[in-house]
Regions:
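The feature marks proteins involved in alpha-glucan
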Residues: 11-53, 85-169, 174-181, 188
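Substrate-binding/active-site clefts of carbohydrate-active enzymes
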Residues: 149-162, 171-319
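Structural beta-strand segments of beta-rich domains
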Residues: 54-58
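Short beta-strand elements bearing conserved aromatic residues within extracellular beta-rich modules
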Residues: 68-70, 106
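Short proline/glycine-enriched turn/loop motifs at strand-loop junctions of beta-rich domains
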Residues: 61-68
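Short, low-complexity, charge-dense intrinsically disordered segments
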Residues: 1-6
Length: 319
């Protein structure tokens, strides 16, 4: 793990015997301690094989839910047809669905303690539908071929903290448009941007938030997908291509990450299982009244794992 905190030598001993019989115990244990720095590798939707069948395993944290099912086009969005089970007799739910594949759309149908059904996007999804739809999409991050080894090696020999920097901050959706007013996708944007950045002498480009968000008119500061680049400009691998091209051109990439608050959109983190999970349950601390947004419960271990994992995810997966 890039944070250096999740090392086996630090955290294996308390659950050593349990993890021999059930390997999933360790990521759940670390998650609940606030020390799972790569929670996205366990939670969310992951393509894998079980008993010779390829499918997708779904895992989600919902401590107050009485039932959860995975719904999507594959089951006509019918609640209860694919029920999840608890993996820890407490708050983490799991289901493997054979036959599901990349780009399949899904949500979690959560039954609250009040008996209501709420349909939620996956907090750990890597990809999402483009507005106005807001479902999550199964996505495989593997397979992108990076070409930025020279950049990575140069960074190891450079004083990146004290060295000179000249940063160009920009909004990906409005910096420059195609004919007809359509935005460039991530990869195309790099091709347009590199000559300008080079000519103007900038060392880095800083993107206003590109994590998934609901409102086109915003700059992206109310995030609904902390592990998903917004699909307005393409797929996760398109964003990888953007970073790769920038690095090949000798340009660093800085991403604007927003843990300060999150919106109240019903498909998002807000009251995820009918009650406060990600937000502070104290109304005096849990809401930005002036923004109409929620504040994370920074003292909750599971939220700490979520946010630390998000920050490190972008560094690890997008270089």
């Amino acid at each position: 793990c890039p944070c250096g905190l999740c090392g086996e030598e630090l955290f294996m001993k308390p659950t050593e015997e349990k993890t021999r019989s059930n390997p999933s115990d360790l990521p759940v244990y670390l998650f609940k301690q606030g020390n799972n720095c790569e929670a996205y590798r366990y939670f969310g939707a992951h393509i894998e094989q079980r008993a010779g069948e390829t499918g997708v395993v779904f895992r989600v944290w919902a401590p107050h839910a009485t039932a959860i099912s995975v719904v999507g086009d594959f089951n006509s969005w019918k609640p209860g047809s694919h029920p999840m089970r608890k993996v820890d007799n407490d708050s983490v739910w799991e289901l493997f669905i054979p036959g599901m594949k990349e780009y399949d759309v899904y949500k979690y149908c959560v039954t609250t303690r009040a008996g209501d059904l709420v349909y939620k996007a996956d907090p750990y999804a890597f990809h999402a539908e483009t507005r106005p739809s807001n479902g999550s999409k199964v996505y495989d991050l593997n397979g992108f071929v990076w070409h930025d080894e020279a950049w990575q090696n140069a960074q190891k020999k450079t004083d990146v903290i004290n060295g000179p920097m000249n940063i160009y901050e920009m909004h990906a959706g409005s910096w420059r448009m195609k004919e007809g007013g359509l935005p460039y996708n991530y990869s195309e944007l790099a091709d347009e941007l590199i000559p300008y950045i080079t000519e103007m002498g900038y060392t880095h480009v800083e993107l206003l938030p590109v994590m998934e968000y609901p409102f086109d008119g915003s700059w992206g500061y109310q995030v609904t997908g902390y592990f998903a680049p917004t699909s307005r400009y393409g797929t996760p691998k398109d964003l990888m291509a953007f970073v790769d091209k920038m690095h090949e051109a000798g340009i660093g990439v800085i991403m604007d990450w927003v843990p300060a608050h999150f919106p109240k959109d019903q498909f998002g983190l807000y009251n995820f299982d009918g009650e406060a999970c990600y937000e502070d349950p104290n109304p005096k601390r849990g809401e930005h009244k002036e923004w109409g947004t929620m504040v994370f419960d920074f003292g909750r271990s599971e939220v700490q794992s979520f946010l630390i994992s998000s920050a490190l995810y972008w560094l690890e997966q997008y270089h």
